[in-house]
Amino acid sequence: MNDATRTSTTPPALPMPDLRDSFPGPFPASAHADDIERHATQWLRTFPLIRSERALSALTHITGQGVARTFPTAGRDELFLCADLFLWLTAFDDAHGEATGAADPARLLRTTSEYVHLLAGHHEPPGGPSVFGAALRDLLDRYGERATPAQYARLTAHLRDNLFGILWEAHHLHRPDRVTLPDYLAMRPHTVFVRTVVATAEVMLGYELTEPDRSSEPVRELETAVADLAGWINDLASYAKETARDGSATLGLPALLMRQHECDLEEAFRRASLMCEQQAAVAAARIAELTAGGGPLADHAHALRSVASSYVWHIDDSRYRT
């Protein structure tokens, strides 16, 4: 077993993926981790998206440490922007998605209309901005100052995907039997926000892919493998916490594998761990292929390696402990 990928929330009897061959640690981290955490705390004072001081402290800590590992070579201001984007998504999901959204999906749908309005380029939503709307406007303004029009369009498209993913998850949370395993695997990258993080990489690190490179098979396969890996290891790491909080974790990879294969929890974890290891190997192979040639493709491969490594690292953080 790989200690880097094991979390204390998972009972020792349950298998966890061994990712040492594909993503060996230790993982490099930016020297700005503490600065990111301090900035994140201040940003959440300016835009009070989280009411609980304990939750705020936990989220700013994992964000500071996680973003420092996601883009370890990025500049300080770029790291702040990436952290704030992750804070917004996570705080919105905690406040309006999951169990809250499942209790009233129609209200969640009405809430998201303000953000769709802003993402479409309208500066003032009808009725004025909420605190989440004001925070999103701040993020979009700052990102727009750094990004090309194409990069900005990609980010806003992924943010819309995230909003849809949160709504999708809330809609199905109390009726997971309606969700097939292929449906879940297709949606999970959007609910774990990893494709949005990947979409920021070019701006964070100062490179730009051509459209032919972006649509090439090696890049698409690498991004898919990293997106899958992020969601799946998150599901394994958070399983015990979700079970302790809600009594079950029925809309997640282990539960869906148990239903699909009519197996017990240990076998589901074993199957999920193998899935993680296989996708990690795919990602590592594509990273090696793309870094060999240099240029923006190599920059992108290095960025994806750091993104994947950050998910491998952060699943052991206290945010996932019961």
Curated annotation (Swiss-Prot):
> Which Gene3D superfamilies does the UniProt entry name for this protein?
Farnesyl Diphosphate Synthase
User: What's noted on cofactor binding?
Assistant: Binds 3 Mg(2+) ions per subunit.
The residues the record assigns to binding Mg(2+) 1 are 93, 98
Intrachain S-S bonds = none
Q: Which cofactors, if any, are listed as required?
A: Mg(2+)
Q: Which EC main class describes this enzyme?
A: lyase
Q: Where is this region: Disordered?
A: 1-26
Name the residue ranges with Polar residues bias. 1-11
Keyword Lyase listed? The answer is yes
Q: Which GO terms describe its molecular function?
A: metal ion binding; terpene synthase activity
Its EC number(s):
4.2.3.193
Main role?
A: Involved in the biosynthesis of the labdane-type bicyclic diterpene labda-8(17),12(E),14-triene. Catalyzes the conversion of (+)-copalyl diphosphate to yield labda-8(17),12(E),14-triene.
**Family label:** Belongs to the terpene synthase family.
Entry remark concerning the domains of this protein: The Asp-Asp-Xaa-Xaa-Xaa-Glu (DDXXXE) and Asn-Xaa-Xaa-Xaa-Ser-Xaa-Xaa-Xaa-Glu (NSE) motifs are important for the catalytic activity, presumably through binding to Mg(2+).
Name under which the protein is recorded: (12E)-labda-8(17),12,14-triene synthase
